[in-house]
Amino acid sequence: MEKQDRIKYLVDILNKYAYHYYTLDDPLIADSEYDVLYDELVNLEKETGIVLPNSPTNRIGGEVLSGFEKHEHLNTLYSLGKAQSKEEVRNWVDKTIEFVQNYNENHVNKLPKVEFYVEFKFDGLTVNLTYDGGYLVMATTRGNGTIGEVITSQVKTINSIPLKIKDTRLMEIQGEGVMPLSSLENYNKTHEPKLKNARNAAAGALRNLDPAVTRERNLDAYFYNVNYLQDNELETQEEMIKFLGDNYFKLYPYEKHATSFEEVSKFIDEIFELRNEIDVLTDGVVIKVNDFKTREKLGYTNKFPRWAIAYKFEPERFTTIVKEVEWNVGRTGKVTPTALLEPVEIGNVTVKRATLNNIDDIERKQVRLNSEVFVRRSNDVIPEIMGVVNPDQEDTEEIEIPHYCPYCHSELFRDGVHIFCPNSMSCTPQLVKRMVHFASRNAMNIDGLSEKTLEVLLEKLNIKSIEEIYDVKKEQLMQLDGFKEKKSQNLINAIEKSKNVDLANFIFALGIPEIGEKTSFELAQKYKSFDNLREAKFEELIQIEDIGNVIAEEIVEFFHDETISNSIDSLLSKGIKIKNPENIEKKLDNLTFVLTGSLVNYSRKELTDKLSNLGAKVSSSVSKNTDYVVYGEKAGSKLTKAKDLGVKLMTEDELNSFLDNL
């Protein structure tokens, strides 16, 4: 259970951190801390073979805010794989060189000797600029890699960004919007509240709906990539950089070429020494293969290009004192410690908290109350405690491990390095988080039933179980602060609408340990009805792809737990009608679809899942291998490209007719 439990924890916490970092521009932890957790998840997934559907390893990036107009990029904006040590850089360099050598041994048309391009990695906000006819026509954020948010007005306040360039072809140019450290210092002399760091200042300015705010922060931008170019003739990174310079894009005056790890390592050290002398926040180095044909042969993972890697510098360490430890309860009942620190200034940020993973983390690092500890961070909020300064420090006290839940006072139990509250039915934090999961879009999809709303319902209406959601009356809601006629009716309508639910969504909503969306779908397809699933046998379950012994045991135990079974029966008595799945044949095998524009009857994810379940591949970019492009309103350049290539086009209605006739 311990490894599976750890995977689930890592997926949940990394998704939370990614949401705050990419979507809210309100990072909760340092990049280095995120990378450590991410690498741990990758290793555990490889070791166990368990990859949850919502794992960040499946993702390219973060979610898109609804406050800005959306825009589809002409090509996917990939993030970069990260190396945490020089040894990892060496391995990447060696693998790349070996790949080219093996390729050349087996092909007549040889690839050139591998040359690496080494450059600064700046810490700001990625901007993607679209030029057509020589003019800037669109500027967007990276968004989730496929769809960004339009920030054209904000970007135009940056004087270093050209509004007109020489080349008249359609193109996308990628760069980094940054706030120079001198601009940050000058801004803080005359403004309150003061900005905490340059990265958040740049991101916040570019994501502000008022361009006047952006202009006031005196941003800059550096460019490093041509993401798309019509009739692209560029063959190397070196040619690309020259093309950017010739078209008035600002380049950072540092570029080095290397043919070996030793040379790459030398340039990494050089940039590390220069980083505190420059006027821009930098947190590492980017290393790319120079030749584009070699890049094409190396290709991509679903998240990163194999031809580039980012090396992040080890953050500086500081010391502070652990004053207290608080214990918080999650959806699964896990009780997690958080260290409250004596405030310490790190990189213009006042740090007061640090997450401690578990009891083992406390014991292994010998952390005690009043201990002087090493903490480290890059440019984000919550640091990592590395260990104590002096294990023999005398004026410290042992951190008391709680025996009773800090919320419901139930007796806790220990499982491995974690402690849990067993009171899953009425422990408020657990109940709230389970209800949030139950109401989430890919579960029962109760629009408007947020965590904040649920906390109010539990407190004011004395709701004690999930099924009581369906007993809430409009009159009760209208008595609560913030609930008027329309909001109350909308929530009641959403609750009522959720009673008609697909079997896969209902299975996912129950929150069975280790069961994500993909496994819920597979269970629905296998058992066809909820009654059949409740009677599932261990021997049957382990025959299903992606379900091993541990997950099979979890499912059997879940449905044989008397309390859970009674709760499910009570839930079903509220009028829940479960739609059983039809037999799905893979009728779209070997067909590739691309979606573009705003859809009416589906979210992009819903339609992607629908097509994927029928065997289709849904791609993020149009090519000659695309079979169909499905387009909605405000379809962008992908539609134009599809027309140019002669790809078959479908409206949403035409797609529905097409699927109905399969």
From Swiss-Prot:
Tell me where in this chain the BRCT domain is found: 583-662
Q: Which domain of life is it from?
A: Bacteria
Pfam families linked: BRCT, DNA_ligase_aden, DNA_ligase_OB, HHH_2, HHH_5
Q: Which cofactor does it need?
A: Mg(2+); Mn(2+)
Residues bound to NAD(+) are D31, S32, E33, Y34, D35, S79, L80, E119, R142, E176, K288, K312
Q: Which GO terms describe its cellular component?
A: cytosol
Catalytic activity annotation: NAD(+) + (deoxyribonucleotide)n-3'-hydroxyl + 5'-phospho-(deoxyribonucleotide)m = (deoxyribonucleotide)n+m + AMP + beta-nicotinamide D-nucleotide
CDD domains cross-referenced by the UniProt entry: BRCT_DNA_ligase_like, LIGANc
Q: Where does Zn(2+) bind?
A: C405, C408, C421, C427
Instruction: Give the annotated active site.
Output: K121
Q: What is its EC number?
A: 6.5.1.2
What are this entry's molecular-function GO terms? DNA binding; DNA ligase (NAD+) activity; metal ion binding
Q: Which UniProt keywords apply?
A: DNA damage, DNA repair, DNA replication, Ligase, Magnesium, Manganese, Metal-binding, NAD, Zinc
The record's Gene Ontology biological-process terms are: DNA repair; DNA replication
Its biological purpose is as follows: DNA ligase that catalyzes the formation of phosphodiester linkages between 5'-phosphoryl and 3'-hydroxyl groups in double-stranded DNA using NAD as a coenzyme and as the energy source for the reaction. It is essential for DNA replication and repair of damaged DNA.
Known PANTHER family for this protein? CHROMOSOME TRANSMISSION FIDELITY FACTOR 18 (PTHR23389), DNA LIGASE (PTHR23389:SF9)
As for family, the record states: Belongs to the NAD-dependent DNA ligase family. LigA subfamily.
The name this protein goes by in its record: DNA ligase
